[in-house]
Amino acid sequence: MTTIVGSNLPVARPSWDHSRLESRIVHLGCGAFHRAHQALYTHHLLESTDSDWGICEVNLMPGNDRVLIENLKKQQLLYTVAEKGAESTELKIIGSMKEALHPEIDGCEGILNAMARPQTAIVSLTVTEKGYCADAASGQLDLNNPLIKHDLENPTAPKSAIGYIVEALRLRREKGLKAFTVMSCDNVRENGHVAKVAVLGLAQARDPQLAAWIEENVTFPCTMVDRIVPAATPETIQEIADQLGVYDPCAIACEPFRQWVIEDNFVNGRPDWDKVGAQFVADVVPFEMMKLRMLNGSHSFLAYLGYLGGYETIADTVTNPAYRKAAFALMMQEQAPTLSMPEGTDLNAYATLLIERFSNPSLRHRTWQIAMDGSQKLPQRLLDPVRLHLQNGGSWRHLALGVAGWMRYTQGVDEQGNAIDVVDPMLAEFQKINAQYQGADRVKALLGLSGIFADDLPQNADFVGAVTAAYQQLCERGARECVAAL
């Protein structure tokens, strides 16, 4: 079968000598996001410098995870990234991978050996939030998690990413080798701390002396990652094949924008990713708050009020000038003042860029999808900024309409009387409230959900008054008119 290796392509393959690469990074979780983000940054560094930092890719799960590793091997570890802008698409053939491993092919031992090699300086992860096996309530490692139980009983044949890291560090300690940096690249707040808690939790349960050695010798930098990478579908893969002239089963599409902010805290060296657009900083948290409030907060605002206004995607929503203007005003007038950013951060440029990203029609980001799980997203994205304004006397009418938009959305019926498929862990509570209350009484009942609003906001007369008024306006006039009136 013809692959991207042997074909004439309309795009250049990597021109550097692949043999110069060393597997100095072992990456756990070779999913779409990693291939469009960290592996791409590393590729651009290889392209523009004489760096030798290559990646040994590891997938741990059966099924599609194994198929991807097999497909990568069939095409010499090359794959295609399609960066889809509003006007055009740029194709890139990425060549930063040196090896690709899977336990069903290489055994646990093959993966642990790679992690325990002297040249391995970083073990990075994109394993999603559940890959850290944390207890939701305490944030500590869940020792009853089936994968963790298995890894405690079979420490030399682990199944979880955390189990592999702890066993590999034990092997390095035994061999007298320097530790590696554990770098989480998951879209989780303070991800380095989350990784550290999990690794130390398992090490402590295995051997307190090992845990003490890890605490002393391993660093867990936090990172903030940003790029919209929709899950690869047969349609997107075929679309890329049509442009490329050959089928690449590992191909992925993404937006042109990418951002990577990394806490500069490495124990055993690191690539100069800052030469290709990443930022090394002392503290990632301000950048996480910037993303959470300005990007995610305005995304939620557009999702609820856009869906109610009859728009299917975020890009459709911001074709309406009133929505576009309101999202920008929310970011600059109400979210930006709540942030404490390092000197030189241009929040106006960031907000302008976000509006441009939201407007990209080739990324069909559905309002319904972003509206999911609002009970978990609302507190961080919209309610915490409101609290700061209530303390400091700032204006927050866009935030009030955003909260009211969520309340109106959870009624489960749109402005035309059609059912809304509300997806939320608290759906049963919403349905109970919907059956008993309407109007201002419904607002009061929703404010009684302390898991969302805590105890302070329902006691604040200004908050209750503003949200109730915004909700009643939405019910009477509809979302489009309310957004236009802001």
Question: Where would I find each of the regions flagged by the language model?
Answer:
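Substrate/ligand-engaging "lid" and interaction regions
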Residues: 1-486
